[in-house]
Amino acid sequence: MTRPIRATLDLAAIRHNYQQAKACSPESFAFAVIKADAYGHGYEQVAAALAVWPTVLPSSTSSRARTLREAGLRQPILLLEGCFDRAELEEAARLQLTVPFHAAHQFDWLKQGSLPAPLEVMLKLNTGMNRLGFRPDEAPRAAAWLQARNDIRLAGLMTHFATADGDPGIAAQLSRFDEVNASLGLPSCVANSAALMRHPASRRQYVRPGIMLYGASPFADQSAAELGLRPAMRLEADIIGVQSLQAGDAVGYGATFVADRPMRIGVVACGYADGYPRVAPAGTPCAIGGQPARLVGRVSMDMLTIDLTSLPQAGVGDRVTLWGGDGVSIDDVATAAGTIGYELMCALAPRVPRRVVGA
């Protein structure tokens, strides 16, 4: 018998969420961001699920892009981080990938000779995130250098917002971007999920929804359900033991939770080795049969404990929803643990059995 824990990945929900993204900006060409193994949802199956739309599938590594090409995917693929050396740049050209150019050292690779095939490039502009990208004063020269190459097609100008999900918003960064592009006149790619949903000025020729595709909210003050998004990942595990406590009894490592009254505690077959956050505190929500419950005690490597006192019918073998259904969102758990839904999705461990629905 396999360990009683499972993750259900809903491809129909991802398609629905992609359509929600498209509805925000119907005239834009919508990237579907599948970096980090499609935020833990499996990049090959997500790419296949979205293949009915003419979209761009950003990937962080050329090896994964190669896998998609070998699987027959012919849509444009953008390497979000760009290439890491000349050899990868040559492979990107052979695979017909789109590559961001973000720093001067990448031009040194081009100086080594012509590429084996024409390469589509986007110029990345650093407008204030201070991660990757040319400074605004460097961008015109970089663009001119690329446009002078016979083996390069400069397809657009892109940037990334640091605070699209809150204050101070995108105005300052977008102003820097537009000032540069006023002279370049390139197609623009600036909107992530948060910008796409809240900042109409960011809806340009290209948009790139990421976290919203997987049914989590990019905002702290608005839930995924309020945004019309459906959860694409549901994590569940079974109760494998029950303990009856008296007042004063402690639960788990460090005895961090002490019962203040008689209680029933359920032991659940999920722990931090499965990707559940060890820092999730007592009170973190879960559900049993649609009824709300909460964690007590410290999350262990393979197990966690929940309060069954108000659920006398619950016992061994009952399924616990840890996130993604029954009123418990991944954002609820992330907030309780002091992190974000992105991290929980990406941290789901390989040992957790996956079940794919909605294909």
Curated annotation (Swiss-Prot):
Transmembrane segments: none annotated. The active site is at 35 (proton acceptor), 253 (proton acceptor). Substrate binds at residues 131, 301. It comes from the Bacteria. The keyword Isomerase applies. It catalyses: L-alanine = D-alanine. PROSITE patterns: ALANINE_RACEMASE. GO terms for biological process: D-alanine biosynthetic process. SMART domains: Ala_racemase_C. Pathway: Amino-acid biosynthesis; D-alanine biosynthesis; D-alanine from L-alanine: step 1/1. One of its GO terms (molecular function) is pyridoxal phosphate binding. Its EC number is 5.1.1.1. GO terms for cellular component: cytosol. Its cofactor is pyridoxal 5'-phosphate. Keywords: Isomerase, Pyridoxal phosphate. The modification N6-(pyridoxal phosphate)lysine is found at residue 35. Belongs to the alanine racemase family. NCBIfam families: alr. Catalyzes the interconversion of L-alanine and D-alanine. May also act on other amino acids. This is Alanine racemase. It comes from Laribacter hongkongensis (strain HLHK9). The lineage of its organism: Bacteria, Pseudomonadati, Pseudomonadota, Betaproteobacteria, Neisseriales. The gene is alr.
